[in-house]
Amino acid sequence: MPGEFSRRDFLQTSGAALAAAGSSSLANHSNAIDEPFAARQERRRKELWGLLGDLPWNHRPEPPRLVSREDHDGYVLERLVLDLNGQEPVPAVLLIPKKRAERAPGLLFIHWHAGMYDLGKEQLVRGVKAQPAYAPVLAEKGIVTLAIDSWCFGERKHEQDGGQGEQDAFKLMLWRGQVLYGMMMFDEFRAMDYLAGRPEVDASRLGAFGMSMGSTKAWWLAALDPRVKVCMDVCCLTDYEELIRTHALKDHGIYYYVPALLKHFQTADINELIVPRAHLSVNGRRDPLTPPAGVEKIRDRLMPLYREYGKEEDCRIELFDCEHVELPEMRKVILEWMDRELVG
C-alpha cells in the first residue's frame, strides 16, 4: 500500500474494499443470492463498520517481523510481530503444517477471554480445559493458521491486573473517539489481510474460528469481511435482548459493549450479513453467556434465508447439553465442518 493514501484510496486498494463493499465478493461466492439482498448487506455492512469508532484506515502497515521459528510435531510455528493498527505492535503466531497443499486453506484462530489475560494467542498451541489445543488437529488437516494477541491480552497485557487494563483501555478509547471492540475487530480484519497474503495460503479458502470471545469475534468478522468463507463459533452466539432479559450483562467483559449498537443491530441482523456463506455455531444449553432461547431465535431467523438461497446445508446452529465448554461431540461436528467447508 504505497505512499500517502486517503481513506478512499485505501478502501479501493486493500482487503478493506471487500469488507466495506462486500456485495461484489458475495455475488461472486454464490450466484444464488439476489441483487437487492446483496445490496442491503453492503449497506448494512458499512453501517456496522461505522459503529466501531474511529479506526486507523489510513495507517500504512510496516512489514511483519519474524521473531523465531519453532519446530513442532507436524508443523512449524512462526512467532511474528505484526503492524496492524499503528498504535501498538501485535504479537502473533503462524502455524504452517509440514504436510499441506501448495496453496492451503487459511484459518484465523481467535482466542477467548475467560479472564485469562496472560494466555492470548498461545491458546492455539496450549489449549485450555474447556477446549483442548487445536494446533495438532489443524496441522494434520493442512490448515495454515494465524492467531494474534488481542488488545489487553498475552504480550499486549500492559497492567499487572488484566481486568483493570481492559477497563482502562475501554475508557481511554472512548475519550479518544475509539471503541475497544472496534479496535479489536480492526486488528482481526488486518490479521486476515496478512493471512490472505501469505504465499502458503489459498485466499479463496479463508475461515474464522473461536470460542467465547473468539466466537463473538469470529461471527462479527465474517459479517464485516466477505473474504471469510467459513465461520465457526463455539459458545457465544448470544442474542443481545435475551442477554438483557436473563440479567446476564455482567457475564460478558467490558470489551463486548459497543456504544449505540442496539439502536441499529441485533445479533441476528449481524449474522444475516454472513448469508449465504458457511456458518457453524455450537453452543451450550446451560451456558449463561448464551441463553438458549436467543440461540433458537437467531437460528429461526437465519435458516429460512439459507434455505431461500439453496444453502440450507451451509448453516448449522446447534445447542448441546453443556455449559461454557466444547464437548467432544461438538469438536466432532467442528472438524467435520472444517473438512467439508474449508479443506474439501
Ranges and model annotations:
Residues 3, 24-45:
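C-terminal segment of N-terminal export signals and the immediately downstream linker at the start
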Residues 254, 300, 305-344:
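C-terminal catalytic histidine-bearing segment of alpha/beta-hydrolase fold enzymes
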Residues 60-100:
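N-terminal cap/lid segment of alpha/beta-hydrolase-fold proteins
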Residues 281-283:
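Short beta-strand/loop motif that positions the catalytic acidic residue
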Residues 174-175, 190, 230-271, 276, ...:
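Mobile cap/lid helix-loop segments that gate and shape the active-site cleft of serine hydrolases
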Residues 167-211:
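Gly/Ser-rich "nucleophile elbow"/oxyanion-hole loop immediately N-terminal to the catalytic nucleophile
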Residues 2-4, 9-29:
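N-terminal export signals
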Residues 110-186, 242-245:
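Cap/lid segment of the alpha/beta-hydrolase catalytic domain
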